[in-house]
Amino acid sequence: VLWIRSIFATSINQSSSGMKSYNKKFVYSICLVSAMGGLLFGYDWVVIGGAKPFYELYFGIADSPTMQGLAMSVALLGCLIGAMVAGMMADRYGRKPLLLISAFIFLSSAYATGAFSVFSWFLAARFLGGIGIGIASGLSPMYIAEVAPTSIRGKLVSLNQLTIVLGILGAQIANWLIAEPIPADFTPADICASWNGQMGWRWMFWGAAFPAAVFLLLACFIPESPRWLAMKGKREKAWSVLSRIGGNRYAEQEFQMVEQTSASKSEGGLKLLFSRPFRKVLVLGVIVAVFQQWCGTNVIFNYAQEIFQSAGYSLGDVLFNIVVTGVANVIFTFVAIYTVERLGRRALMLLGAGGLAGIYLVLGTCYFFQVSGFFMVVLVVLAIACYAMSLGPITWVLLAEIFPNRVRGVAMATCTFALWVGSFTLTYTFPLLNTALGSYGTFWIYSAICVFGFLFFLRALPETKGKSLETLEKDLIK
C-alpha cells in the first residue's frame, strides 16, 4: 500500500527550458487505474458469450428463445440505468466516488453471477453487472480526458478502449481455457452433466473478481478530477492535482482556462444541456455514440458463435476463432493509440466508417454465395481490425472531449445512454434480421449504415486534435 501511495504522490519540477512537461509516471498511473473500469467492462460484456451454451443447459432455457434473449440482454438494461445515474451523480459528487462504486459493483456481480443456481438470481446478478458497465463506460474516459494534458489526451483516452479490448480478449481466453473439450458424441444432457455445464461457466464469470478487487484498491489512491474540483469552487485541491500533473506553470495555465470557461456561467444539468447553444454538439455526440453500435461490429462479439458456425465451423473451433478476433482487436487498438494524435480523430472515424462499409459489403456477398471456411474468418478479423483502430476507441475520445466541463457528466451520461440503447437495438434485432434476411442481407444493411456514417462524419464532424477542452468549448458552443 505504501508503494502504491508513493506512485500517486509523485510531484514534478518544471523543466528549465520552459516547455510544457508533465509527470508521466503520475499521469499514466491514474489514467491506467481509471481505465481498469474499461477492462472490467470488456470482460463482463463478452464473457457471457462463452458461458452461454453451458448456463442455458444448466438453467433449462436452451429451448426458450425468450429466456435466452433475456439472459443476454438484461445487462443492457442495467447499462442504461448505470449510465444515466452515473452522469448525474458524477456532476454532483465527483468522478472518483463513482469509479469506486463501479469497482465494487463489478466485484459483487462477478461473484454473484457464478454463485447463484436459480435463474432469476442469475438475471439479477447480470443486471447488477450491467449497472457497473454503464457507470464505467462513461466515467472512465471522462475522468481520463479531464486529467490528461492536451498533447496526449487522445492517446490516454484511447487507453480506455485498449483496456476494454484487453478485457474482451481476457474473457475470450478464459472461456477457451476453462471450457473442457466437448466430445463429438455428447448430447445436451451429457454437456449439462459435465464440468462445463456444472462449474465451468461459473469460473468464467468468477474470472473478473480479481481485477475488480485490484481496481477497487487502486481507485482509492487516485485524485479527484481537477476540472470537477475547479467547477465546484475547490480551488486549492484543483491546483494541487494540476501541479502534480504538470508543475506550477502547467497548473496556472490550465487553471486560468478552466476559470475562464466557468466564470459567470450557470450550473450544469439536463436543462442546460438541452438548451439551444448545446443542441448541435449534443446531437453530434448522440449520433457518434449510436453509430459506434449500429456500425454492426459488436454483434460479432455477442453472436460470434452463431456467425462462425454459419461459416461452417464446429463449436470447438469457434472458441479458438473467437480468441483470434480478440487478438486482432488488441493489436489494432494499439494502432489507434499510435495514430490518434498523428492522423486526428476525424480521419480515423472516416476510415472506420468507410472501411467497414466495404468489408460488410464483401462479407454479405460471401454469405450470399455460401462461401465458408478460412476466408470468412479473414473478413471478420478485418472488420474487427478496422473497428479497433477507429470507431471503437475514437468514439470515446470524442465524447470525452466535445462537451464543456459544467455539463460533461450529464452529457456523457446522455450519450452513453444513447449508446446502450443503440447496443440493445443492435443485439435484439440481429437474430431477427438474420432470420428474415439471412446473414448476407443483415451485413448489407450494416454496410448501408456505415455509408451513412461516413457521409455524416464528412459533413459534420470537427477535428479536436491538439485543442484544450476549454478551447473546444469556445469553438463548439456558440
PLM regions with names:
Residues 7-8, 15-235, 241-243, 263-478:
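Alpha-helical transmembrane bundle of multi-pass membrane proteins
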Residues 237, 250:
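Short phosphate-engaging motifs
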Residues 242-246, 258-259:
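Extended, hydrophobic alpha-helical segments
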Residues 251-260:
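Short, well-structured alpha-helical segments
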